[in-house]
Swiss-Prot record:
Protein role: Involved in DNA repair and RecF pathway recombination.
GO biological process entries: DNA recombination; double-strand break repair
Family: Belongs to the RecO family.
InterPro entries: ARFGAP/RecO (IPR037278), DNA_rep/recomb_RecO_N (IPR022572), NA-bd_OB-fold (IPR012340), RecO (IPR003717), RecO_C (IPR042242)
Protein name: DNA repair protein RecO
A GO CC annotation given for this chain: bacterial nucleoid
Keyword set, alphabetical order: DNA damage, DNA recombination, DNA repair
Length: 264
């Protein structure tokens, strides 16, 4: 059956002399393994567009019983090379597509996840984007779709409102608890140090702001908060939080290298 769908390229590997095996995340079918015959032949008009991180409209010869689907056509929608190559954009890009690839099942359709992924990458591929803030927003939305949204308004132990308590005392005395997930006031419970991370007030404020940010476009604009170390911290924290709650977030070495690049 010939079908059309929008897709994000999650991974590409060489196959034989001139072809590619691709891992795609598609709007209609979820994650698929596909082959692009002649995809590495410079004379093939499709050879340059099926690259990791690209958003495409594609045509497939799809058979549900077949493990690898055949790509017959495609057109580019968005590419991280436009407006130009950028190490920070690429760092965020590969974190995002690796996370989706490693945490989704074959043929596991999720329109909400595809919408999140597509909208994030479309913003990521624009100029003057708050990359770190956008990445933290994506992680917060992603983990919420998995059913592990952290509590950012009330203390996970006492139930008291974080903003009200912080206003009445010294700032900086907050904790982020991996399980149960969310913010906690100091002294509310005896916690395992491996399960808790201290969090500065500006980072807690950013998390709260991102939880109220409904679109990737708004997050890419910084959600009204200047891009800085708080955004980097939130991205790293939420990445660890995702890893804590999900079973298949591999790629530890790759993520560590990219984290170092983004910190420089």
């Amino acid at each position: 059956m010939i079908v059309k769908t929008r897709a994000v390229v999650l991974r590409e590997i060489k196959y034989r002399d001139q072809s590619k095996i691709l891992t795609l995340y598609t709007r209609e079918f979820g994650r698929l393994a596909c082959i692009l015959k002649g995809g590495r032949n410079p004379k093939n008009r499709l050879s340059g567009i099926f690259s990791a991180g690209n958003v495409l409209d594609i045509v497939l010869y799809r058979k549900p019983e077949r493990e690898v689907q055949l790509i017959s056509d495609g057109s580019l929608v968005s590419c991280p090379m436009v407006p130009g190559p950028d190490i920070e954009r690429f760092g965020v890009l590969y974190r995002i597509i690796d996370l989706v690839r490693l945490t989704t099942e074959h043929d596991g359709r999720s329109p909400r996840l595809f919408s999140l992924l597509e909208s994030t990458l479309l913003e990521l591929n624009r100029e003057r984007v708050a990359y770190r803030t956008l990445y933290a927003w994506f992680l917060l939305r992603f983990i919420s779709l998995q059913g592990f949204a952290p509590e950012l308004c009330r203390c996970v132990f006492s139930g008291r409102e974080i903003a009200a308590d912080a206003a009445g005392g010294p700032r900086g005395e907050l904790l982020f608890v991996m399980n149960p997930g969310g913010l906690a006031l100091p002294g509310t419970a005896c916690t395992d140090g491996r399960n808790v991370r201290p969090i500065l007030p500006e980072a807690a404020d950013l998390l709260a702001a991102l939880s109220r940010t409904s679109t990737a476009e708004s997050a890419a604009g910084g959600s009204g908060i200047p891009e800085g170390s708080a955004a980097l911290f939130c991205g790293t924290l939420l990445q660890e939080y995702c890893r804590h709650h999900l079973e298949h977030t591999g790629g530890q070495k790759n993520l560590a290298v990219i984290s170092q690049l983004l910190a420089e």
